[in-house]
């Protein structure tokens, strides 16, 4: 028998089907749908493939991020997925838009076996109004999510039982061997990183909000640096938490929802996100209390990458039409585990390009007794390395052009550690300190402060910020041992230089190269 197609179901209908068909799906105490993605609890970057076609061959930065797949192999991957989908009893179809700016939006169709995936994408994308759905017609882009079916490693270019393949020519994505929902939303982001530069628009892995005076702030950052938390501000309207485009008119959100890390979610300090996890939301790989059905946001027994997905409408004050003006402030978020970065610095144009393409953050090891792992840097180009299609310096120059054109201020904000290394017991920057800095950026007072230059790094550090302890502002003053500070600073500078020289130096402008940090020893703290 052919599959039964369930097209564009409502939230209650999708929840009902999930509870009926998915043995491990259940409702939380507050009505969110708790689901499991099983074996894969995160993206599979080594299994992502870009189809090598004539129209994109010269634009793609081929390598370990964008791995080639031939058109013939893609046809076989797609056939495997469609043949599997044809055997399923139930298929769920979601027709939605990607992009709040109607001039650039894509009509996206998702075909999947799991109601959870349909509900997820119904939140992640923009749900058409009834009249828009009536004239939706053929989609611009189709996602075939056959994640319950394993990929075939005998197909040339496929190296495991997982394959996430994107074809820009046929406007299709095929998913095999992974049920992690994030593959779908990041597929859309990758498509926009290819499409938007054709129109001279900058695609951004970033969150954004807007103040009452129309002042827009964009937050760049890799996963875990605070994009979602910091953009959900009770005094400002949320534009979006993850994927945006900067056009000739301003900023628009690609998505219709948010996908937040759930581990450690605190209802007191992250109330907006906590309150959003209710009926209509998806709680992915979260553990529930057996007796109450409440989510245990500190339980990592399934995975550390627990997630919650919810529509923008769940955030009080979020823009229903997520389009705003040009950014007044751009903030680069870094989770520095070495304790060398200041909590905030104002960047020059050259520094903005450098820090954007280098995309620095750090992986933080556990600090339990007996742990021998050390902190290590992560350099994710443009704070979204896994999703870039073109070379990072291309996007860096795009950003520099736009910030100069619109006089945007660029800031580096460290949400990581101060006074020492994370792997040696240093404490993370308190959220209240980070929020105080952001408040000072938004009210304009931080721009009026007196600044000093951080030796070697060249960063401009304020000498005072309201409600921020003075000893935190200059990193070396928070340390107790000058030798340890010098050794750590030298180690990090060398890793910056090595990463830049290996990945960007050949294509970087002289202006960008001038911002590469150098080591300067300090004699006292």
Predicted regions and their residues:
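Glycine-rich, often acidic-flanked micro-motifs
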Residues: 1-31, 197, 205-207, 211-222, ...
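N-terminal accessory targeting/assembly segments
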Residues: 1-135
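Gly-rich Lys/Arg/Thr-decorated short loops/hinges at beta-loop-alpha junctions or inter-strand turns
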Residues: 57-62, 167-172, 376-382
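Charged, amphipathic alpha-helical linker segments immediately N-terminal to NTP-binding catalytic cores
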Residues: 138-141, 145-195
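Conserved lysine of the Walker
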Residues: 227
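Hydrophobic positions on the alpha1 helix immediately C-terminal to the Walker A/P-loop
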Residues: 230
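Generic C-terminus detector
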Residues: 472, 477-525
């Amino acid at each position: 028998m052919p599959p039964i197609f369930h097209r564009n179901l409502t939230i209650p209908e999708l929840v009902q089907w999930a509870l009926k068909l998915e043995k491990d799906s259940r409702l939380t105490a507050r009505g969110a749908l708790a689901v499991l993605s099983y074996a894969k609890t995160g993206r599979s970057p080594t299994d992502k493939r870009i189809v090598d076609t004539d129209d994109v061959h010269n634009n793609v930065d081929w390598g370990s991020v964008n791995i080639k797949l031939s058109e013939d192999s893609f046809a076989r991957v797609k056939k495997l997925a469609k043949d599997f989908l044809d055997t399923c009893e139930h298929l769920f179809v979601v027709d939605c838009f990607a992009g709040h700016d109607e001039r650039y939006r894509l009509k996206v169709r998702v075909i999947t076996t799991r109601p959870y995936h349909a509900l997820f994408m119904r939140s992640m994308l923009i749900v058409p109004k009834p009249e828009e759905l009536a004239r939706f017609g053929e989609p611009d882009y189709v996602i075939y999510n056959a994640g319950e079916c394993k990929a075939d490693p005998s197909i040339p270019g496929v190296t495991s039982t997982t394959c996430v393949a994107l074809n820009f020519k046929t406007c299709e994505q095929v998913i095999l061997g992974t049920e992690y929902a994030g593959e779908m939303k990041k597929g859309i982001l990758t498509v926009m990183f290819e499409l938007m530069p054709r129109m001279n628009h900058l695609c951004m892995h970033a969150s954004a909000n807007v103040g009452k005076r129309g002042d827009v702030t964009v937050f760049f950052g890799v996963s875990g640096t605070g994009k979602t938390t910091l953009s959900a501000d009770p005094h400002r309207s949320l534009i979006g938490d993850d994927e945006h485009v900067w056009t000739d008119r301003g900023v628009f959100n690609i998505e219709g929802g948010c996908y937040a890390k759930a581990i450690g979610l605190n209802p007191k300090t992250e109330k907006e996100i906590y309150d959003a996890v209710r009926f209509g939301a998806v709680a992915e790989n979260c553990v529930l209390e057996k007796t109450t059905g409440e989510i245990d946001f500190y339980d990592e027994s399934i995975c550390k990458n627990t997630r919650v997905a919810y529509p923008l409408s769940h955030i009080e004050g979020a823009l229903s039409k997520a389009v705003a003006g040009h950014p007044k402030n751009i903030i680069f978020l870094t989770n520095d585990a070495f304790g060398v970065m200041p909590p905030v610095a104002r960047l020059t144009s050259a520094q903005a390009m450098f820090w954007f393409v280098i995309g620095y953050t750090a992986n933080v090891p556990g600090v339990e007794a007996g742990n021998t792992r050390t902190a290590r840097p992560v350099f994710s180009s443009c704070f979204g390395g896994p999703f870039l299609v073109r070379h990072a310096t291309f996007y860096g120059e795009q950003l520099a052009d736009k910030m100069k054109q619109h006089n945007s201020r660029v800031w580096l904000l460290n949400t990581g550690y101060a006074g020492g290394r994370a792997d040696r017991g240093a404490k993370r920057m308190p959220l209240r300190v980070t929020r105080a800095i952001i408040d000072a950026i938004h009210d304009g007072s931080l721009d009026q402060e007196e600044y000093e230059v951080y030796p070697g790094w060249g960063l401009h550090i304020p000498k005072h910020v309201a409600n921020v302890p003075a000893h935190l502002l200059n990193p070396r003053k928070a340390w107790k041992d000058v030798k340890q500070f010098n050794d750590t600073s030298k180690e990090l500078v060398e890793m910056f230089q090595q990463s830049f020289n290996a990945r960007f130096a050949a294509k970087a402008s002289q202006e960008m190269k001038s911002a590469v940090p150098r080591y300067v020893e300090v004699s006292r703290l």
